[in-house]
């Protein structure tokens, strides 16, 4: 082959790869809408879109006010949060996938939105009286509690998906059928106590998680995700099988700020998967690498899919201690994937990308200021500042960075977008936390947790490794298709006590163990979402 022919061939390959990548980026929204329940939203246009946008932005500002200056009791804060989340969920998520008629919201959705938030606002308005009633709640409170719970379940079906709802339904049925509890008692525990819907998960979600979601929205607006991908390309793109290594490194970096393994998969996979296929990796291997890497982003400090905040509440350990201790397991996870793709590349004889195709460090280093928000956040947390204060200061720094970023400057419109995205992100996580609270209280009030401990200890014969294996199986089964935050709450309520109380395992080690294997459920074949996205 002559030099001229080689040059033509190289140009054809480059053009083909660019077409694939552009096509993939154009198809991202379609892929997300097809496989990710959270991405199937209503289509609002014109004035209704603007109104909803500013309402969500105002909701996020209200959350900031409530966390920094309001002096209301915990139950009032949580009920207000859940009430608004339910109200906005019906305006964002249609009754089924594919409902794309612009500016359309059927009457029954409006009815459900109003009916769903009324019980929570009723709780706020009658807070002192309801607390004084204790377990002897009246029929009005029982009916409102049932409505509030059922509408929350419908919100979960729309915004989160069926898996966690099915799990919660099984636990509620066990309370009625397995333990013979009355309707009044179940409703009281689920709806009116601080162990149920407005329990610890919602408490953490309405405070720390909401503020960190706001931080993440503004950090994303600075373009830091693209910076991470460019850095990963420059760092390992030239190595043997470079694109797969880029997928691993970029997923780890993006995972530091991402709260969604699906979102992480699409953000990095839309760039790395076409490159992996072009280099010579089999399509199924490319998809598997991206799915495993992006899922691992949920165990990457400091955000850890927002589960780290709830772990701090449930274990009593400082948030800073948790993220420091999570560094080594996260490093080992990604090291294992990195070595796997390296050996696969050597086996297939794959080479890396050409140096001239990769981003230049001299162009990337001037953009290192994009990391300032993350650095400030981590420094404040490790220095012992409160999580709320750290998140707010990190958000302020992210806004400043966005303003001085010449390549993607923060405009007033982008500022409102950041608030809007923060509000939207609160919806699915808030709903998942509410449903997880139902699961948690059912386990507590039925005594099911004690039975699980007894069964596992008997089956394991007191052997820790067998108990760990059995607990791992439980985590993978219960964690399939469940969002990260709710996933951890379920694991901490059902599986962690097995190791802590049954096998005398260290509380933090047990919680880390069940959290990691609950996350691994995302790449278990039955849980198809995270596997289907990258191969699409």
Question: What is the role of each PLM region?
Answer:
Residues 2-132, 142-146:
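Conserved, well-structured core domains of diverse proteins
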Residues 55-57, 77-91, 108-117, 142-151, ...:
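Hydrophobic mid-bilayer segments of alpha-helices in multi-pass membrane transport proteins
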Residues 118, 154, 158-159, 163-174, ...:
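Core transmembrane alpha-helical segments of multi-pass membrane transporters/permeases
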Residues 139-143, 195-208, 234-248, 279-285, ...:
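Membrane-interfacial loop-to-helix junctions in multi-pass transporters
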Residues 208-209, 230, 241-255, 281-295, ...:
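Alpha-helical transmembrane segments of multi-pass membrane proteins
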Residues 212-264, 268-283, 452:
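Membrane-embedded helical hairpins/re-entrant loop segments and their flanking transmembrane helices
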Residues 267-279, 309-324, 459-461, 475-520, ...:
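Membrane-interfacial helix-loop connectors
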Residues 529-535:
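Conserved small/polar residues in nucleotide/adenosyl-binding loops
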């Amino acid at each position: 082959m002559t030099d001229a022919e080689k040059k033509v061939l190289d140009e054809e390959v480059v053009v083909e790869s660019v077409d694939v990548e552009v096509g993939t980026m154009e198809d991202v929204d379609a892929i997300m809408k097809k496989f990710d329940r959270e991405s199937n939203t209503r289509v609002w246009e014109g004035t209704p879109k603007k109104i909803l946008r500013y309402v969500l932005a105002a909701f996020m500002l209200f959350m900031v006010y409530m966390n920094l200056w309001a002096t209301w009791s915990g139950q009032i804060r949580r009920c207000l949060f859940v009430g608004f989340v339910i109200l906005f969920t019906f305006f964002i998520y249609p009754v089924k996938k594919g409902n794309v008629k612009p500016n359309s919201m059927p009457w029954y959705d409006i009815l459900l939105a109003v009916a769903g938030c009324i019980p929570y606002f009723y709780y706020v308005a009658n807070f002192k009286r309801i607390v004084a009633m204790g377990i002897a709640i009246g029929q009005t409170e029982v009916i409102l509690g049932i409505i509030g719970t059922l509408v929350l379940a419908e919100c979960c079906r729309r915004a989160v998906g069926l898996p966690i709802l099915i799990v919660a339904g099984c636990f509620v049925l066990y309370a009625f059928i397995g333990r013979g509890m009355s309707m009044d008692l179940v409703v009281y525990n689920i709806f009116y106590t601080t162990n149920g819907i407005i329990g610890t998960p919602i408490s953490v979600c309405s405070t720390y998680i909401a503020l960190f979601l706001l931080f993440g929205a503004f950090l994303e607006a600075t373009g830091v995700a693209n910076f991470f991908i460019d850095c990963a390309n420059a760092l390992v793109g030239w190595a043997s099988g470079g694109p797969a290594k880029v997928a691993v490194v970029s997923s780890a970096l993006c995972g530091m700020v991402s709260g969604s393994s699906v979102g992480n998969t699409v953000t990095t996979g839309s760039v790395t998967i076409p490159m992996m296929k072009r280099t010579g990796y089999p399509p199924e291997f490319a998809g598997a690498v991206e799915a495993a890497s992006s899922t691992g982003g949920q165990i990457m400090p400091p955000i850890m899919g927002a589960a780290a905040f709830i772990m701090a509440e449930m274990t009593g350990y400082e948030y800073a201690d948790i993220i420091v201790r999570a560094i080594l397991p996260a490093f080992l996870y990604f090291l294992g994937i990195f070595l796997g793709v390296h050996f696969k590349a050597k086996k297939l004889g794959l080479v890396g990308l050409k140096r001239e195709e990769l981003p230049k460090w001299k162009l990337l280093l001037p953009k290192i200021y994009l990391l300032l928000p993350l650095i400030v956040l981590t420094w404040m947390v490790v220095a012992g500042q409160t999580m709320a204060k750290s998140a707010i200061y990190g958000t302020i720094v992210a806004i400043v960075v966005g303003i001085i970023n010449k390549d993607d400057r923060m405009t007033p419109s982008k500022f409102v977008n950041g608030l809007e995205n923060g509000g939207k992100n609160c919806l699915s996580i808030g709903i998942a936390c509410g449903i997880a609270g139902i699961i948690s209280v059912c386990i507590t009030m039925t005594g099911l947790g004690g039975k699980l401990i007894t069964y596992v200890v008997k089956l394991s014969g007191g052997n820790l490794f067998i108990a760990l294996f059995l607990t791992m199986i439980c985590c993978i089964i219960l964690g399939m298709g469940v969002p990260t935050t709710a996933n951890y709450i379920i694991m901490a309520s059902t599986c962690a006590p097995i190791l802590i109380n049954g096998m005398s395992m260290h509380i933090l080690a047990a919680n880390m163990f069940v959290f990691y294997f609950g996350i691994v459920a995302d790449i278990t074949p039955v849980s198809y979402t995270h596997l289907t996205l990258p191969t699409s």
